[in-house]
Amino acid sequence: MHILITSGGTTEQIDDVRGITNFATGKLGKILAEQFLTANHQVVLLAGLTALVPDDHPNLQIIRISNVDSLAIAMKHWVPKMDACVHTMAVSDYTPVYMTDLETVEKTKDIQSLLTRQNTEHKISSQEAYQVLFLKKTPKIIASIKNLNPDIILIGFKLMVDVSDAQLIQTARDSLYKNNADYILANDLTTISETHHKGLLISHNYIQKAETKEKIAQLIVSKSEEVYEKYNHRSNR
């Protein structure tokens, strides 16, 4: 199979020296890529700028991703060529529009007019005691994947914090239906550590638990191969 994996996190630039990012390390994406390579699949890894990545491999191509826009461009290029996509990347929900001092905001009668402005400085001044940063919502990358390739096997990820398994499963199933995914790997930040990572791989009628990143990766590889083989079997009948 030809596998597309997204991994790590995006960074949305405020100016040339500042940005909004997240704590994603890309460790699970790295392990996933290694497991797919071990199973003799071709892998394209879209990795955040600081994400962990595997060692060089003849069947591996690594492309570094900076922000949501660069991820969207890469997805449009690669998704139509792939058999499966494992979308683990922690994608920024918001991107900066404009940053200014609090006094300017307070004096502006039409606050929405600030949304049409852009910062032109390479480094925004840090002289002011308070700054206001306007953000706008970014497009949901996972929602575009099946539109780009209706036949792709799509495995998405849903991370929540300190919720019950029932809530985790329901939220994952909501994402499954909304994005037309084949599976969602649901996990809770409070159950993730250096040695432990509880994940629930969920489909419309299936739930399987894994307790480490390695086991999660093995499960995803196995299920991807299973769906691919079933699809090809039907296509070749």
Which ranges hold each PLM region?
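A cross-family phosphate/adenosyl-ligand binding-site feature
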Residues: M1-R237
